[in-house]
A protein has these predicted regions:
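Charge-rich, solvent-exposed alpha-helical interaction surfaces
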Residues: 8-11, 78, 121, 152, ...
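Hydrophobic/aromatic-rich, well-ordered segments within soluble, folded domains that form packed cores
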Residues: 52-69, 264-267
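Amphipathic alpha-helical scaffolding segments comprising HEAT/armadillo-like alpha-solenoid repeats
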Residues: 84-92, 114-139, 160-174, 196-209, ...
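Secondary-structure boundary/capping micro-motif
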Residues: 1-60, 78
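Charged, gly/pro-enriched flexible loop segments at helix/strand junctions
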Residues: 63-82
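Ankyrin repeat arrays, specifically the small/polar loop and inter-repeat linker segments at the C-terminal end
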Residues: 177-178
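Structural detector for internal amphipathic alpha-helices that build alpha-solenoid repeat scaffolds
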Residues: 92-113, 137-162, 171, 181-197, ...
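Short, intrinsically disordered, low-complexity segments enriched in Ser/Thr and Pro
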Residues: 1-26, 82-125
Length: 285
C-alpha cells in the first residue's frame, strides 16, 4: 500500500476523531439532565450512544462529499478507483491502525467488487485469524487489535448480505469454551444480520446444548436468537427461548433474553422464577 493511501486514511481518521469529540461535547451537557424515571448510568450510556450515532452520520456525509485534496473526488470515489488488492490492504491497515476503524465507504467499496473474489478474501481472513489470545501466533501483537481484521471482513459480508458462512462461523464460535466480549459482539452482528439463515441454526444449537445448561458461548447464542426475535417474533423462537430459560444455568441471562424478546407469556415465567428465588432465600435464612 502506498504512503499516499496511508496519509489519506490517517487524515480522515483524525477528522473522524474530531467529529466524535465535538459530538461528545455537544451531548455532554445533557448527561446531567436525567429524565424522571431514568437512572443516571443508563441515561449517560444512552447519550453516548446517540453521540456516536450522530458521529457516524457525520462521517458518512464527509466520506461522500468531494474533497479538493482528492482531486475533487469523494473518499468513496477514491476507494472505487483502487484495485481490490489495494482495498484489501487498506482495510487491514485501517482495522489495526486507525482509532475510528475502517471507513464505511471502504467497506461499501469492497462489497461492490466481484462477489466471489471478496467472499474468498473474507473467508481467508476470518478463517486464518486468531479468535482467542491463545491462537495468536505473534505474542508481540495485541489480540484485540488483530481481531479487528476479522470484524472488518464480517462487516463487508454484512454489507454484501453474504451469509453463506453463518454455519461455519457459528461452528467455530461454539468450539471455544469462552470468547472475549468483542468477539461475541462481532459474531452477533453478522448472525443477527442473517436472520433468515441464522434462526434454524441458532435454534438447533440451543436444543443440542440444553442438557449442558447453555453455558459459555451457548449464552451468546440465546442472546442472538432473542435479538432476532425482537424484530421478527415467531412462535418457534419463543418456544426455543422458553426452553432455554428453563435450562440455562445462568438464569439472569435467560431473564434478560425473555424480557428483550417482549412476549407477554414471558412475564409469568419471570415472576415464578423471582418468587422461587425469594422462597429459597427465605428458607435458607
Amino acid at each position: 500500500m502506498t504512503e499516499e493511501i496511508k496519509d489519506i486514511l490517517k487524515r480522515y481518521d483524525e477528522i473522524g476523531a474530531l467529529i466524535l469529540e465535538q459530538k461528545l461535547d455537544e451531548y455532554g451537557d445533557k448527561i446531567g439532565q436525567v429524565p424522571e424515571g431514568s437512572d443516571a448510568a443508563s441515561f449517560e450510556e444512552y447519550i453516548q450512544d446517540v453521540a456516536r450515532e450522530e458521529t457516524e452520520k457525520a462521517k458518512q456525509t464527509l466520506e461522500s462529499e468531494p474533497d479538493e485534496k482528492l482531486g475533487g473526488k469523494s473518499l468513496r470515489e477514491y476507494f472505487d478507483s483502487m484495485t481490490l488488492e489495494e482495498k484489501e490492504e487498506a482495510l487491514e491497515y485501517s482495522a489495526v491502525t486507525l482509532d475510528c476503524g475502517v471507513p464505511a465507504s471502504l467497506i461499501a467499496s469492497i462489497a461492490s467488487e466481484d462477489r466471489e473474489s471478496v467472499r474468498d478474501y473474507c473467508s481467508t481472513v476470518i478463517g486464518d485469524s486468531a479468535w482467542t489470545e491463545e491462537e495468536l501466533d505473534d505474542q508481540d501483537k495485541l489480540f484485540e487489535i488483530e481481531y479487528q481484521k476479522v470484524k472488518a471482513c464480517l462487516d463487508v459480508l454484512i454489507e454484501m448480505k453474504e451469509f453463506c458462512f453463518v454455519q461455519a462461523v457459528l461452528d467455530r464460535f461454539m468450539s471455544y469454551h469462552q470468547t472475549k466480549e468483542f468477539v461475541a459482539e462481532s459474531i452477533k452482528d453478522y448472525v443477527v444480520g442473517a436472520a433468515e439463515v441464522s434462526v434454524p441454526i441458532l435454534m438447533n444449537i440451543i436444543e443440542e446444548n440444553l442438557e449442558d445448561g447453555l453455558e459459555g458461548p451457548s449464552e451468546d447464542i440465546v442472546i442472538m436468537l432473542a435479538e432476532i426475535g425482537m424484530a421478527l417474533p415467531s412462535e418457534e423462537i419463543y418456544q426455543t427461548l422458553r426452553h432455554a430459560f428453563r435450562a440455562m444455568t445462568n438464569k439472569i441471562y435467560a431473564v434478560i433474553c425473555l424480557a428483550e424478546y417482549g412476549d407477554d407469556r414471558a412475564v409469568p415465567l419471570m415472576k415464578n422464577y423471582i418468587n422461587r428465588l425469594i422462597h429459597i432465600s427465605s428458607y435458607r435464612g
